[in-house]
Design a protein with these regions (language model features):
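Conserved acidic carboxylate
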Residues: 11, 85
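Two-component/phosphorelay signaling modules centered on CheY-like receiver
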Residues: 13-33
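Acidic, metal-coordinating helix/loop segments flanking the phosphotransfer/catalytic sites
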Residues: 34-52
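Active-site residues of response regulator receiver
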Residues: 56-58
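Short amphipathic alpha-helix used as the core "switch/output" element in two-component signaling
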Residues: 66-77
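A Lys-centered signature of the CheY-like receiver
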Residues: 104
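Receiver (REC) domain switch/active-site region of two-component response regulators
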Residues: 107, 116
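CheY-like receiver
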Residues: 113, 120-150
């Protein structure tokens, strides 16, 4: 087991958010906060400083995950951002700066494996374990880890 990560969950469907929270905790990590919209994320304390954020694309109050991603990159630039969505085709080629995506529907094991892989890379980049099939990485992920190692 790697060190424990501090994780933000941005998901407007309460049952999915609760499921994600259980998976995070089952992985030995901690949920710092949950949010259902960009407005909820903007209301979080500036010193929250998550290490990983799971972000849905379609959110409450006519907000979207792409805007949340930009906000997180500005306010918590060290956070890894992973979209969790059934709408993978809605993610732009540059991932809006995010580090990867997990497609819905997802399996418990798939999310747990992705969390552990990302945690391994956060604390000792690049990860020493193989990337799980559940995580579709963006070019930003490898670039971040190569920059950290250099």
């Amino acid at each position: 087991m790697t060190d424990s990560m501090q994780i933000l969950i941005v998901e407007d469907e309460m049952l999915l958010a609760m499921d994600m929270e259980a998976m995070v905790e089952d992985s030995g990590h901690r949920v710092l906060a949950e949010a259902a919209s960009l407005q909820d994320v903007e209301a979080l304390p500036d010193d929250l400083n998550p290490q990983l954020a799971f972000v849905d694309i379609h959110l409450a109050h006519d907000s979207n995950g792409l805007d949340v991603c930009r906000y997180i990159r500005t306010h918590w630039p060290d956070a890894l951002i992973v979209f969790v969505t059934a709408n993978v085709s809605k993610i732009p080629a540059d991932f809006s700066g995010a580090h990867g995506v997990i497609a819905k529907p997802f399996s418990h094991a798939g999310v747990v494996n992705a969390i552990n892989y990302l945690a391994n890379g956060v604390f000792a980049p690049p990860p020493s374990m193989p990337r799980p099939a559940s995580l579709i990485p963006s070019p930003n992920l490898e670039a971040r880890w190569m920059k950290t190692v250099a």
